């Protein structure tokens, strides 16, 4: 796997245990909103069973002017995450591989979109909505249900910025029952006149896919993010 070098410029603590790593863009490197890449850190001592590469979604867009990934670092974490938390500093180099994935909005094919995101699964959604903010589609309505059981939400300022985008509604939810109820209500009301994007852990993606299909939503209307990096 070939890696290009990006320079870390800033680390932002988004929540009590989630951090964004912001980097320069290597000349000639491009990507589409919703894609993920392999990131590589070198020069740090890692556990023998650990590796220096992880897949994370690119949470920024080309228009942002920087590369960014966001990851959760729990109390119990790998030596890779320990390097991110306590060792890596602005000015250090991070390897970036070729972008992968096709997780995207279809604002031309549908009049409505429901986005269901849980926890750190919000990262591709941030990129998709950032791109949509620059190029909104007239008459298209997007509803975002972003849930975190602890009530800790990444990108707080970004959600305020989205309030200016016509047709975009964001609900920040900290109650799991409300999260599921709001999803059910939307699916029952809108049915297959919308596309449904799900971004969370593999378990959440599977559970909500089954839930939506049980409410009559066609499989082809449901997209799930490949949640590789934690």
Show where each model-derived region lies:
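Ferredoxin-reductase
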Residues: 2-90, 148-150
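FNR/FR-type flavoprotein reductase catalytic core
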Residues: 78-230
């Amino acid at each position: 796997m070939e890696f290009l070098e990006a320079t870390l410029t800033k680390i932002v603590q988004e929540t009590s245990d989630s951090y964004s790593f912001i980097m320069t863009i290597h000349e000639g490197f491009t990507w589409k909103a919703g894609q993920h890449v392999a990131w590589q850190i070198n020069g740090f001592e890692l556990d023998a069973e650990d590796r220096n590469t992880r897949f994370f979604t690119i949470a920024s867009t080309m228009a942002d002017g920087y590369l960014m990934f966001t990851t959760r670092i729990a109390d119990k974490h790998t030596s890779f995450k320990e390097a991110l938390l306590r060792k890596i500093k602005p000015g250090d180099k991070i390897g970036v591989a070729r972008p992968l994935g096709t997780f995207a909005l279809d604002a031309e094919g549908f009049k409505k979109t429901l986005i269901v995101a849980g926890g750190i699964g919000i990262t591709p959604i941030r990129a998709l909505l950032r791109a949509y903010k620059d190029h909104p589609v007239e008459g298209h309505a997007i509803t975002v249900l972003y849930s975190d059981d602890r009530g800790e939400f990444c990108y707080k300022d970004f959600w305020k910025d989205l309030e200016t985008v016509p047709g975009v509604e964001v609900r920040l939810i900290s109650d799991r029952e409300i999260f599921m109820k709001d999803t059910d209500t939307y699916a029952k009301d809108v049915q297959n006149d919308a596309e449904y994007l799900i971004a969370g852990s593999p378990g959440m993606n599977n559970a909500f896919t089954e839930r939506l299909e049980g409410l009559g939503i066609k499989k082809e209307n449901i997209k799930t993010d490949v949640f590789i990096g934690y």
